[in-house]
Amino acid sequence: MNKEILAVVEAVSNEKSLPREKIFEALECALAIATKKKYDQEIDVRVKINRKNGNFETFRRWLVVNQVLQPTKEITLEAAKFEDVTVKVNDYIEDKMISVTFDRITTQTAKQVIVQKVREAERAMIVEQFRKYFGKILTGIVKKINRESITLDLGNNAEALILKEDMLPRENFRLGDRVRGVLYAIYPESRGAQLFVTRSKPEMLIELFKIEVPEIGEEIIEIKSAARDPGSRAKIAVKSNDKRVDAVGACVGMRGARVQAVSSELCGERIDIVLWDKNSAQFIINSMAPAEVSSIVLDEDRHTIDIAVDSNNLAQAIGRNGQNVRLASQLSGWEINVMTVDDLKLKHQEEKDKILNIFTKYLKIDQKISNILIDEGFSSIEELVYIPFNELLNINSITQELAYSIRESAKKALCAIELENKKVINERKLHKDLLNLKGMNQKLAFKLAKKNIFSLEDLAEQGIDDLIDIENLNSNTAGMLIMAARNICWFGNKTSA
């Protein structure tokens, strides 16, 4: 029997390309489980196989604890010290026992455990083997095709899955096709597929350019960001770390060879190569190519930007189904609003009129002074309260007396606004759960209360269009707050609170 154990270990190790130690551990576990099944009581067993001659010994063991909860598997520290004075809590006390004899049931149990343990070891080895390829392009042969995914054979018993959402639209594969994709997820504990590959994520575009453009690997050119509408269009932002190298030209290649190679791999996806710029405004203008931008207005606080284009360029700037502006927004990380030059002027005039009315109402100043403050960049009462006084004095046409008057009026106005907000709350109290919502603050809650939104239930019923007119609230934040409220109210997800 001992020689048979060594023969089994050698055979399985060679067949599965697994270390002999892993097979020995699987056998020890299998023999321990088979031994436990011989007893009516639940006991703990350890089996030790001699790696040289195949002999094995079996030990019953007890865990050393302060308080015994399972008498058949645990022993108190005081009792354990009679066996070994050096023993500590969480150590084991062991007694040698009779090793199991290999009858039919024992053999069947051992076989099942060994198969399971070997499979687990194989999966662990595959995960370890491919961990270094995370985020890199893998090539595999199509092994299996179904509606929701395809399975790639990566060799050495390793397989990867490409889900439907990770494929390109209208992409068709046949058995035996060679397919490339980026490894983006590894699940070590998964019972099903462990390796997941994508062809639709921006990482695929980035990795293809790294292959086609040697300057990227040499770090002469740096890829800053990428955005994709998979299979249709993409934008990638690049920057040169060497003034002598044209980043865009290097990525395009001679007669467009490099970008064409990437496009061909992605089923003809049209790719715009954009020059990255540390100036956000210039980068966004570059991102909007091929549309020509007439003027832009950035809102740093809300991280939004209004872009004006000529009316005859509006369709091109927006793109089919908003594709161009959506990709530019993803590429730059800014929320971009595209409109005609006239619409932008009208929008900003409306915003200016709104601020003008607030200033004239609360600060008791004429329109001329209000316009001066607006032209200097002031857009709220709070800014006039907390700005250093010297900055007010430095504004043309603002005397010291007028500056004091504006500051005092602003302080009184701020108090009046707070009282007005408290009145709104007292008339119909704001719910605590709304105030505690992630991303919510008291100032925003007051503004919601003015729109008769006093609870999470009220907020969950709103749409983004209902909230977008609130000052300093962009569509992304509005959408995030609404979804958080819905998750709590409709789906009972308290983690959004």
From Swiss-Prot:
<feature type="repeat" description="2">
    <location>
        <begin position="439"/>
        <end position="489"/>
    </location>
</feature>
<feature type="repeat" description="1">
    <location>
        <begin position="364"/>
        <end position="414"/>
    </location>
</feature>
<comment type="similarity">
    <text>Belongs to the NusA family.</text>
</comment>
<feature type="domain" description="KH">
    <location>
        <begin position="302"/>
        <end position="372"/>
    </location>
</feature>
<protein>
    <recommendedName>
        <fullName>Transcription termination/antitermination protein NusA</fullName>
    </recommendedName>
</protein>
<feature type="region of interest" description="2 X 51 AA approximate repeats">
    <location>
        <begin position="364"/>
        <end position="489"/>
    </location>
</feature>
<dbReference type="InterPro" id="IPR003029">
    <property type="entry name" value="S1_domain"/>
</dbReference>
<dbReference type="GO" id="GO:0003700">
    <property type="term" value="F:DNA-binding transcription factor activity"/>
</dbReference>
<dbReference type="GO" id="GO:0031564">
    <property type="term" value="P:transcription antitermination"/>
</dbReference>
<dbReference type="InterPro" id="IPR010214">
    <property type="entry name" value="Tscrpt_termin_fac_NusA_C_rpt"/>
</dbReference>
<dbReference type="Pfam" id="PF13184">
    <property type="entry name" value="KH_5"/>
</dbReference>
<dbReference type="InterPro" id="IPR030842">
    <property type="entry name" value="NusA_bac"/>
</dbReference>
<dbReference type="GO" id="GO:0006353">
    <property type="term" value="P:DNA-templated transcription termination"/>
</dbReference>
<dbReference type="InterPro" id="IPR013735">
    <property type="entry name" value="TF_NusA_N"/>
</dbReference>
<dbReference type="InterPro" id="IPR012340">
    <property type="entry name" value="NA-bd_OB-fold"/>
</dbReference>
<dbReference type="InterPro" id="IPR009019">
    <property type="entry name" value="KH_sf_prok-type"/>
</dbReference>
<dbReference type="InterPro" id="IPR015946">
    <property type="entry name" value="KH_dom-like_a/b"/>
</dbReference>
<dbReference type="GO" id="GO:0003723">
    <property type="term" value="F:RNA binding"/>
</dbReference>
<dbReference type="InterPro" id="IPR010995">
    <property type="entry name" value="DNA_repair_Rad51/TF_NusA_a-hlx"/>
</dbReference>
<dbReference type="Pfam" id="PF14520">
    <property type="entry name" value="HHH_5"/>
</dbReference>
<feature type="domain" description="S1 motif">
    <location>
        <begin position="135"/>
        <end position="200"/>
    </location>
</feature>
<dbReference type="InterPro" id="IPR010213">
    <property type="entry name" value="Tscrpt_termination_fac_NusA"/>
</dbReference>
<keyword id="KW-0694">RNA-binding</keyword>
<comment type="function">
    <text>Participates in both transcription termination and antitermination.</text>
</comment>
<dbReference type="InterPro" id="IPR025249">
    <property type="entry name" value="KH_dom_NusA-like"/>
</dbReference>
<keyword id="KW-0805">Transcription regulation</keyword>
<dbReference type="InterPro" id="IPR036555">
    <property type="entry name" value="NusA_N_sf"/>
</dbReference>
<dbReference type="InterPro" id="IPR004087">
    <property type="entry name" value="KH_dom"/>
</dbReference>
<dbReference type="Pfam" id="PF08529">
    <property type="entry name" value="NusA_N"/>
</dbReference>
<keyword id="KW-0889">Transcription antitermination</keyword>
<comment type="subunit">
    <text>Monomer. Binds directly to the core enzyme of the DNA-dependent RNA polymerase and to nascent RNA.</text>
</comment>
<keyword id="KW-0677">Repeat</keyword>
<keyword id="KW-0806">Transcription termination</keyword>
<dbReference type="GO" id="GO:0000166">
    <property type="term" value="F:nucleotide binding"/>
</dbReference>
<keyword id="KW-0963">Cytoplasm</keyword>
<keyword id="KW-0804">Transcription</keyword>
<dbReference type="GO" id="GO:0005829">
    <property type="term" value="C:cytosol"/>
</dbReference>
